[in-house]
Design a protein with these regions (language model features):
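Short-chain dehydrogenase/reductase
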Residues: 41-52, 72-75, 79, 103-105, ...
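Conserved active-site helix of classical SDR/Rossmann-fold NAD(P)-dependent CH-OH oxidoreductases
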Residues: 2, 45, 49-56, 112
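A conserved pocket-lining segment of Rossmann-fold NAD(P)-dependent short-chain dehydrogenase/reductase
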Residues: 87-105, 109, 127
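Structural signature of the Rossmann-like NAD(P)-dependent dehydrogenase/reductase core
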Residues: 17-18, 66-72, 103, 127
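Mid/C-terminal beta-alpha module of Rossmann-like enzyme folds, strongest
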Residues: 113-173
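Conserved beta-loop-beta element that borders a ligand/cofactor-binding pocket
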Residues: 53-76
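Short linear elements at protein peripheries
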Residues: 104, 109, 172-193
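Conserved Rossmann-fold NAD(P)-dependent oxidoreductase catalytic core, especially the SDR/UDP-sugar
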Residues: 3-43, 58, 63-66
């Protein structure tokens, strides 16, 4: 680590912004905030937390470290979970009308948050998110609509969602409430962006 700090100082770097993930918390439901204890379950979440720990060890009075833990990122060209939702929206003839709340962030809003973090030389842990929560079924319906498809939402399918949430990780991931609290959504432990 000493070599890394020395190289950064010699290059005139005074801040590091690390894009981590909500995955460090290791949960698939519930409200979260920057004070929630990380307990990653996946290799992805574990690797993000290890990187956070290594990078924050570089923090000192002349070197700011901002760790951003965004929720699912959506927008053109996004991969991962958002791409899975796009595929479902394209092929599903109907979808459950099941209410849930999720934190998400658009690529544009995340880019703006990163810029603001750099512009203010913010230091700390941040959980950026869009101003409004998202409901999975409404999002899938909207994605279908963007592709010229009318996707009916049916409450009669909701018992299947309850079973899927109880017995499958995919069901919990898609339909559980998983969100950052609004009071803590964009605030850091060591500062604000």
């Amino acid at each position: 680590m000493f070599f890394s700090v020395y190289v950064l100082e010699e290059a005139g770097v005074h801040q590091f912004v690390f894009l981590s993930s909500m995955s460090v918390y290791g949960v698939d439901q519930g409200p979260l905030d920057p004070m929630t204890t990380p307990e990653p379950k996946s290799n992805y979440g574990k690797s993000k937390l290890q990187a956070e720990e290594g990078i924050t060890a570089l923090r000192d009075e002349s070197f700011a470290v901002a760790v951003l833990r965004p929720p699912m990122v959506y927008g053109p060209g996004c991969k991962g979970n958002y791409r899975s939702l796009q595929k479902i929206a394209k092929i599903a003839p109907v979808f459950p009308d099941y209410e849930n709340i999720r934190s998400m962030i658009s690529m544009e809003n995340l880019a703006d948050f990163v810029k603001q973090t750099l512009d203010t030389r913010a230091d700390g842990l941040f959980c950026p998110q869009d101003p409004e929560y998202v409901c999975t079924c409404r999002m899938i319906r909207d994605i279908a609509g963007e592709n010229g498809k009318n996707l009916p939402l049916l409450k009669v399918l909701n018992p299947a969602v309850v079973l899927a949430k109880k017995f499958t990780g995919m069901g919990r991931k898609a339909f559980s409430d998983l969100y950052y609290t609004k009071s803590q959504g964009n605030e850091g432990q060591n500062g604000e962006a």
